[in-house]
Amino acid sequence: MRGAHYVAIVLLVAAGGQTAAGFDQDEPQHAPDNGYMASVDLRNEFLQSRALQASRNPKDDLMFSAGDEERTPLARSNYLKKVTIPDSIINTANAMRMEGKQVRL
């Protein structure tokens, strides 16, 4: 049985090697017209440019340009939020999990 696993792994590695050898990386990457980058090397730069925020300088009220922006990490509150679930839903889920037996927490 071990021999079959080794043969299967060798075949998968060989097939992957042929697929990688057949992939031509010299083809030009065309960027779509909607502003998204197609090149893997530019992906980080693109994502960082989308996270720019306006300068906190009060003199820069209405003057926004690339020079007036600074890179800041997103606040945790924007993507981590505590979800409150009503007790009735929790009790119903516990009852379904326990096959109808009422369980109080």
Swiss-Prot record:
GO CC terms: extracellular region; host cell cytoplasm; host cell nucleus
Domain topic, free-text comment: The RxLR-dEER motif acts to carry the protein into the host cell cytoplasm through binding to cell surface phosphatidylinositol-3-phosphate.
Position of the signal peptide: 1-22
RxLR-dEER (motif): residue ranges: 50-71
Source organism per UniProt: Plasmopara viticola (Downy mildew of grapevine)
Role of this protein: Secreted effector that partially suppresses the host cell death induced by cell death-inducing proteins.
Main location: secreted
Keywords for the protein's UniProt record, in alphabetical order: Host cytoplasm, Host nucleus, Secreted, Signal, Virulence
Domain of life from the UniProt record: Eukaryota
Protein name: Secreted RxLR effector protein 158
Cell location: Secreted; Host nucleus; Host cytoplasm
Family: Belongs to the RxLR effector family.
